């Protein structure tokens, strides 16, 4: 900050000179108006810059996430790191086995990898699924498993988003009173799935050729090892016959396979005694598996004679903590057929963020392992972000982004705003102007007047309901003042502004409330409306904060000048007489150039360091995990002022 000392003519005695502090402002300065004080500045900058989200996945906290993967996250692979799509650091966070997938472990088809997936984390990242795809050619009474896979993955993502821990339960307790044996199927590699298990009755020729109704029991545990189970994902499987004649080759009754809870309520299965057959002309039944979310307890299975499909496994969830879920597209490279069940499942599950490739999978180690695009999309897992969303992740602190971030999103996510709408604050060389509050006269020697804001640290908290409160602290009693009337006027203005902003938000919500239950698009529209309203409210409140900042900085600079004037008066003693605020008369014959340098230029030394760059911090805080609209909004603005902001003094003399 540069000021000059200017000699003013008009004194009767030539040996006496008048020296005054005088601010220097020219056309290169811009004027910034504030509450109670204004500033001239050589530069200006926006309170925040727009941030651009980075594509791909990231996490909010490195210590609270877990991944579930396969060979593409396998650090033990001999071809690692060329075979992986993640770094070594990220691979350590995954539970995996090459060739595995959650669905393979759920059903256990013969000849496939069977891995005990389990782990805990607030945020769960799933990069698996490709090992059960059309390329795997899994039959077992069903050639196309894509729709079952979609339903399975959707339920996994839904339950994972509500749980801290999850685990495969690979051996359910069961009771089968009838004499049955584990069955096999020729179209299932002369074996069968591990879940459900196929049991068949041995019917002797002399007995009823249809056999007896099957009745069996299985128990879903409340705990599996160290993992608590509040809810289980169970596959309820049954055969679908095209007609009664196809099943009734022995003249038996209709087909049924039904699961009951401990109260006798039907929870899953198929009963052709009350439900029609498909009516198609096929001769071979098809197996269908529905996904059930069941509480721990004892369940019974009843089926028509001859065949029994028995649940043997489940996935267990503790349902203790809600958190983000990220699903990564899992597809093969060239030459292998993939499905897009993971993509569809995630997109249809609230709270699930999908990471998708834009190009075909091209591996480095082979055609199917080590894709560069996927590595880039997953590189963010090495870092912590402030915000994660369907649009990408952000680690900058700015509360604004150019485009609306698509939900789901978690953390402290920026709001969409136009760059020109973000308020600007003064920067560079700052010079205060006179204040407006003339009712406060202490200290009397004030050079530039008194402002409506006091000196020191200004703390502004803005919460969901608007301005939450102010903490205004003065550096010292002589550091300026604020009248009760001016303070009340400032608070009244801010309060009115906030009420207007709140009213706009409420109107937007009311317009869409009556449509939400009938229109999914209305939900998305409401989310966008609320985001836009929050952005407008925040921009409006930042404008208020900007005005407070300008006024506070202005009064701080004015106090610095007053302190400088006081210091000059003290150093001068009897050699200079203060005739008006910031002006002195000195006898040139008594106090020569070296004397004046001591008084006014402090022997060419800087008595106080130059003011540092404006220290402003505005922290946008919202509910750590929200989908759609935020549950809260807070802004903290803290301003630190230097005690003195004079970097040099020039003395101009005229006789």
From Swiss-Prot:
GO terms for molecular function: host cell surface receptor binding; sialate 4-O-acetylesterase activity; sialate 9-O-acetylesterase activity. It catalyses: N-acetyl-9-O-acetylneuraminate + H2O = N-acetylneuraminate + acetate + H(+); N-acetyl-4-O-acetylneuraminate + H2O = N-acetylneuraminate + acetate + H(+). Residues 310-364, 311-365 are annotated as: Esterase domain-2. One of its GO terms (biological process) is viral budding from plasma membrane. Glycans are attached at residues 26, 61, 144, 189, 395, 552, 603. The chain crosses the membrane at residues 631-651. Changing residue 368 to A: Complete loss of esterase activity. It comes from the Viruses. In natural infection, inactive HEF is matured into HEF1 and HEF2 outside the cell by one or more trypsin-like, arginine-specific endoprotease. Disulfide bonds join 20-583, 120-165, 140-188, 210-252, 229-316, 237-289, 346-352. InterPro entries: Capsid_hemagglutn, Hemagglutn-estrase_core, Hemagglutn-estrase_hemagglutn, Hemagglutn_influenz_A/B, Hemagglutn_stalk_influenz-C. Residues 15-630 are extracellular. Homotrimer of disulfide-linked HEF1-HEF2. This is Hemagglutinin-esterase-fusion glycoprotein. It comes from Influenza C virus (strain C/Johannesburg/1/1966).
């Amino acid at each position: 900050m540069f000021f000059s000392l200017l000699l003013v003519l008009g004194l009767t005695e030539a040996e006496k000179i008048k020296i005054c502090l005088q601010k220097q402002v020219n056309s290169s300065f811009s004027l910034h108006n504030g509450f109670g004080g204004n500033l001239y500045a050589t530069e200006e900058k926006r309170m925040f810059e727009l941030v651009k989200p980075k594509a791909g996945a990231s996490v909010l906290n490195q210590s609270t996430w877990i991944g579930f993967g396969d060979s593409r996250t396998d650090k033990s692979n001999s071809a690692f790191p060329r075979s992986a799509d993640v770094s070594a650091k990220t691979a350590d966070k995954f539970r995996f086995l090459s060739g595995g997938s959650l669905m393979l472990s759920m059903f256990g088809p013969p000849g496939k990898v069977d891995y005990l997936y389990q782990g805990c984390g607030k945020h769960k990242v799933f990069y698996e699924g490709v090992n059960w795809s059309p390329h795997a050619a899994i039959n077992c009474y069903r050639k196309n498993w894509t729709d079952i896979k979609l339903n399975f993955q959707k339920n996994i993502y839904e339950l994972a988003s509500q749980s801290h821990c999850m685990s495969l339960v690979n051996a359910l307790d069961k009771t089968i009173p009838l004499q049955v044996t584990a069955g096999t199927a020729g179209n299932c590699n002369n074996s069968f799935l591990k879940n459900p298990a196929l049991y068949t009755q041995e019917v002797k020729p002399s007995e009823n050729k249809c056999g007896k109704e099957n009745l069996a029991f299985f128990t879903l545990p409340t705990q599996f090892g160290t993992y608590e189970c509040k809810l289980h994902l169970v596959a309820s499987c049954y055969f679908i016959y095209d007609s009664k004649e196809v099943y009734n080759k022995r003249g038996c009754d209709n087909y049924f396979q039904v699961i009951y809870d401990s109260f006798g309520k039907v929870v899953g299965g198929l009963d052709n005694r009350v439900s029609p057959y498909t009516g198609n002309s096929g001769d071979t039944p098809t197996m269908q598996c529905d996904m059930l979310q069941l509480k721990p307890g004892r369940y019974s299975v009843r089926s028509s004679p001859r065949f029994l499909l028995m649940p043997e496994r489940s996935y267990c969830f503790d349902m203790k903590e809600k958190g983000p879920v990220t699903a990564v597209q899992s597809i093969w490279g060239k030459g292998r057929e993939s499905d897009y069940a993971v993509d569809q499942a995630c997109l249809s599950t609230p709270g699930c963020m999908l990471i998708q490739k834009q190009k075909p999978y091209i591996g480095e180690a082979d055609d199917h392992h080590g894709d560069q695009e996927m590595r880039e999309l997953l590189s963010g897992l090495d870092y912590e972000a402030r915000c994660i969303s369907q649009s990408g992740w952000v680690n900058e602190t700015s509360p604004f982004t150019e485009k609306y971030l698509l939900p789901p999103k978690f953390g402290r996510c920026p709001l969409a705003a136009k760059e020109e709408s973000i308020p600007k604050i003064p920067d560079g060389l700052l010079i205060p102007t006179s204040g407006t509050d003339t009712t406060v006269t202490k200290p009397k020697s004030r050079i530039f007047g008194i402002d409506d804001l006091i000196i020191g640290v200004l703390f502004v908290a803005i919460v969901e309901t608007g301005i939450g409160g102010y903490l205004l602290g003065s550096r010292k009693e002589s550091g300026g003042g604020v009248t009760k009337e001016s303070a009340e006027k400032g608070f009244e203005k801010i309060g009115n502004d906030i009420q207007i902003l709140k009213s706009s938000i409420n109107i937007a919500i009311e317009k869409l409330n009556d449509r939400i239950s009938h229109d999914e698009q209305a939900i998305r529209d409401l989310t966008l409306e609320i985001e836009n309203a929050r952005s407008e409210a925040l921009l409006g409140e930042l404008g208020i904060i900007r005005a407070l900042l300008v006024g506070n900085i202005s009064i701080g600079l004015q106090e610095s000048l007053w302190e400088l004037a006081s210091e000059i008066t003290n150093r001068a003693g009897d050699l200079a007489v203060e005739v008006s605020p910031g002006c002195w008369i000195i006898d040139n014959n008594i106090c020569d150039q070296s004397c004046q340098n001591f008084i006014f230029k402090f022997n060419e030394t800087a008595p106080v360091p130059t003011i540092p760059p404006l220290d402003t911090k505005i922290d946008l805080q919202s509910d750590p995990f929200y989908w759609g609209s935020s549950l809260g909004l807070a802004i903290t603005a803290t301003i630190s002022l230097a005690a003195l902001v004079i970097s040099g003094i020039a003395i101009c003399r005229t006789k």
